[in-house]
């Protein structure tokens, strides 16, 4: 059993290394925000009476695909490096930061759906980040 546990940990570490390069603090932040967003989304759906398992499954699928997209961004950086184009993980970092901002926006929207007051300036910033500056 102990050997299986060690083997499983080694396989997981190799997979993470292949998919994301090294695990960075930005990935830890993204993972944390993904979990918080999913949790706040569940609570907001419960408060508004819109909770259902199909929507929850779609939410989990979307969260998984965030990490698929980040892995693809890392692979693009790796391919570019292999052909002599040094990106310094620019595509990977851009993807991670994009999804971090997206998760933050969603968390604040969930807070509003739960009835938690969201400061006007924060609402304006979210509108700008979403590309809807008219609000």
From Swiss-Prot:
Q: What is this protein called?
A: Uncharacterized protein BH0965
Matching entries from NCBIfam families are given as:
holin_tox_secr
Q: Does the keyword Transmembrane helix apply?
A: yes
Any GO CC annotation of this UniProt entry: plasma membrane
Give the primary localization class.
membrane
Similarity remark = Belongs to the bacteriophage holin family. Cp-1 holin subfamily.
Query: What domain of life does the UniProt record list for this protein's source?
Result: Bacteria
The compartments listed are: Cell membrane
Q: Which residue spans traverse the membrane?
A: 7-25, 29-51, 64-85, 89-108
Q: Which UniProt keywords apply?
A: Cell membrane, Membrane, Transmembrane, Transmembrane helix
Q: Which InterPro entries does the record cross-reference, listed alphabetically?
A: Phage_holin_4_1
Taxonomic lineage is: Bacteria, Bacillati, Bacillota, Bacilli, Bacillales
Q: State the annotated membrane topology for this chain.
A: Multi-pass membrane protein
Does the record bear Membrane in its keywords? yes
């Amino acid at each position: 059993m102990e050997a299986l546990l060690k083997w499983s940990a080694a396989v997981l570490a190799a997979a993470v290394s292949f998919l994301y390069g090294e695990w960075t603090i930005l990935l830890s932040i993204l993972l944390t925000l993904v979990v918080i967003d999913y949790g706040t989304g569940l609570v907001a759906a419960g408060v508004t009476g819109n909770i259902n398992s199909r929507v929850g499954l779609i939410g989990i699928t979307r969260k998984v695909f965030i990490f698929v997209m980040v892995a693809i961004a890392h692979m693009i950086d790796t391919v570019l490096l292999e052909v002599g184009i040094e990106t310094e993980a620019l595509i990977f970092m851009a993807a991670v930061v994009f999804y971090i901002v997206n998760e933050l926006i969603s968390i604040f929207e969930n807070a509003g759906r739960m009835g938690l007051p969201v400061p006007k300036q924060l609402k304006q910033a979210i509108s700008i980040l979403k590309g809807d500056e008219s609000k």
